[in-house]
A protein has these predicted regions:
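A short, glycine- and acidic-residue-rich donor-binding loop in the catalytic cores
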Residues: 80, 168-170
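Carbohydrate-associated surface elements
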Residues: 34
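Short glycine-/acidic-enriched loop or helix-start segments at secondary-structure transitions
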Residues: 2-3, 72, 110, 170
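Hydrophobic/aromatic beta-strand patches that form the interior of the parallel beta-sheet core
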Residues: 29-31, 136, 158-160
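Acidic donor-binding loop of glycosyltransferase active sites
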Residues: 149-167
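A short, active-site helix/loop in glycosyltransferases that binds the activated sugar's phosphate group
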Residues: 1-28, 37
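Short loop/turn motifs at secondary-structure junctions
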Residues: 24-27, 94, 155
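Conserved catalytic-core segment of nucleotide-activated headgroup transferases in glycan assembly
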Residues: 37-149, 153
Length: 170
């Protein structure tokens, strides 16, 4: 046995009682997903046409697949992220932008329209007279070098995620 882990329980009289054990008989290795440091690295001057036209100087970035399902049903929780973003920055004098690098399933025009419809549905949850911050959809495939430019863009100040239920399911 390479390792033995015992689960102990505190009894009312103060004594400890063993309630289970885990024996690890074979060493395991965990290989975390890596990063290609030749591609993903700091850049001195980063420009990406898709982001350059965004008017805000401060933007949040979210990157993730917008899964199927209704509000609160996708693992990335993009709908809730947008709703919370609107709530936090509605009617503020200076508003940041939110850039969503996302798609639902494909990079098709129909998929893009579906993502825009979802954003609009969330926007419609708020009173019409509210001044809501801008949410930008960056839809489509980007190369690793373009993604690095996106991550390093001077307007992007913060990466945000409400993801839950993540795993290694490939």
């Amino acid at each position: 046995v390479k390792a033995l882990y015992e689960k102990m329980q505190q009894l009312p009289n103060g004594e400890q009682q063993k309630v289970g054990e885990l024996k690890l008989e074979k060493q395991i290795e965990v290989l975390f997903e890596g990063v290609d440091k030749d591609v993903f690295k700091p850049l001195d001057n980063s420009s990406l046409d898709l982001v350059d036209d965004i008017k805000e100087d401060f933007a949040f970035l979210h990157v993730g697949l917008w899964g199927k399902g209704g509000y609160g049903e996708d693992r990335k929780d993009i709908a809730k992220l947008i709703k919370l973003f609107y709530e936090a920055f509605a009617n503020k004098k200076e508003q940041p932008g939110l850039i969503l690098k996302s798609n639902s399933a494909t990079f098709s025009i129909l998929d893009r329209e579906e993502c825009l419809r979802k954003i609009n549905n969330i926007k419609n949850m708020f009173p019409k007279d509210w001044n809501l911050p801008n949410v930008y959809l960056l839809h489509g495939s980007l190369s690793p070098k373009e993604m690095n430019k996106l991550y390093n863009h001077p307007k992007i100040k913060c990466f945000v995620s409400l993801a839950h239920g993540e795993g290694f399911g490939r």
